[in-house]
């Protein structure tokens, strides 16, 4: 059995969350496959040993896995296509579910995030910024939320660029509903990924969890507009923790949506003062 299927069957079991899955994954060797006999070499609790054995013996798990593979691609931590940058982050996703062009996982990428309720300042900045990224063959990643996320994805597609959407729910859900057409277009022309099983519904706590993937997947993160308590700042701070470049679009101090980017600049983020994007900067 390949290790991706092994991890997926573990993930499907009740009571096996991220920490337990990581405990098992850390003990696997560097090969691509695992056999039932290999389990004897693992130093696991009885609970985790039983879960590993069920992977090989539970026919219901086989059925569930086949259903998932009919719906999407599954990329595991041990697969060659798994992005190297994500391997380096704290709490890397061990399984990614994907629809679209998974070769984009190895492409140079910049994440753009910001307010769900931006002013036209964000729209103007993104519409000037993204064509330059596309010309440099850089993919644009974002979270498919309304507002800045949607503007970033749309600008990439409009300029015949590549875009990656990292969502905080399963791939079978369209959230927000207003982005149904955009999500469908990203599947056709870009890449849609999630660490959640395909039928997982959107829940508020999942979006901050998703942000670590947005931060880790890219070389850098750009914040256009965000309030000082915005979730976009979570992504920016995660990027800083992972030694990624953080860029912020400065704005007037009278605009509360510029409070987040301005604070990031004060904390050491690189201010975006033009749209040249020299190779040494991005």
Can you say where each PLM-predicted feature lies in the sequence?
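Glycine-biased, small-residue-rich flexible motifs in mid-sequence functional cores and linkers
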Residues: 77-282
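Short, positively charged patches
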Residues: 1-124
């Amino acid at each position: 059995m390949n290790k991706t299927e092994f991890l997926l069957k573990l993930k499907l079991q009740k009571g096996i969350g991220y920490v337990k899955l990581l405990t098992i994954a850390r003990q696997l060797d560097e090969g691509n496959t695992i056999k039932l006999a290999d389990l004897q070499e693992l130093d696991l609790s009885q609970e985790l040993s039983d879960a590993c054995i069920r992977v090989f013996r539970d026919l219901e798990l086989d059925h569930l896995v086949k259903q998932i593979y009919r719906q999407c691609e599954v990329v595991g931590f041990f697969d060659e296509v798994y992005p190297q940058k994500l391997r380096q982050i704290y709490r890397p996703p061990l399984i990614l579910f994907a629809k679209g062009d998974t070769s984009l996982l190895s492409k140079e990428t910049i994440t753009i995030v910001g307010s769900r309720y931006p002013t036209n300042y964000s729209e103007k900045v993104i519409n000037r910024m993204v064509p330059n990224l596309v010309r440099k063959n850089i993919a644009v990643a974002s979270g498919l939320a309304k507002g800045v996320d949607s503007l970033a994805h749309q600008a990439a597609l409009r300029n015949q660029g590549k875009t990656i959407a990292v969502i905080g729910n399963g791939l079978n859900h369209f959230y927000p509903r207003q982005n149904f057409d955009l999500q469908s277009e990203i599947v056709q022309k870009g890449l849609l990924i999630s660490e959640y099983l395909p039928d997982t519904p959107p829940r508020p706590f999942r979006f901050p969890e998703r942000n670590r993937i947005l931060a880790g997947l890219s070389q850098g993160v750009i914040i256009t507009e965000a309030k000082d308590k915005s979730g976009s700042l979570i992504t920016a701070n995660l990027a800083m923790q992972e030694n990624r470049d953080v860029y912020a679009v400065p704005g007037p101090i009278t605009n509360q949506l510029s409070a987040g980017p301005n604070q990031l600049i004060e904390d050491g983020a690189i201010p975006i003062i033009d749209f040249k994007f020299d190779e040494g900067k991005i």
